[in-house]
Amino acid sequence: MRVLIVEDEWLVALEIQNVLEDLGHTVVAIAADARKAREAVAMGVDVALVDLNLRDGLTGPGIGAELVRSGATVMFMTANPGQLGAGVPGAIGVLPKPVEHEEVKQASIYLEAVRFGQAMPKPPSRLREFTH
């Protein structure tokens, strides 16, 4: 699975990348702002894990919506889930940070199943799924 990480905290992004790569996924890019995230779409993205508050401000919700429109499966990961209100149409949901390694693993398994129409595993327990 080709994953885009949209996260401006470098150490958090690297932790997520390590978990995903250990599971055999390819991290196509780590984007710390909207411009980098838009550039990464051209690399082919199956799934995006998107923070809300990035280097250029509260641009995560808009980037998530753009990624959904481009065909990516999107899950938000943020310390401020309330900022999403009812959610972003087409996105899977939001996982509150801090996120443990096991939650990243569960999230990736869940997102892969959603993306590729596989048997649905149990979602991460703290995932707030959007209903649209």
Residue positions per predicted region:
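Two-component/phosphorelay signaling modules centered on CheY-like receiver
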Residues: W10-A29
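Receiver (REC) domain switch/active-site region of two-component response regulators
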Residues: E100
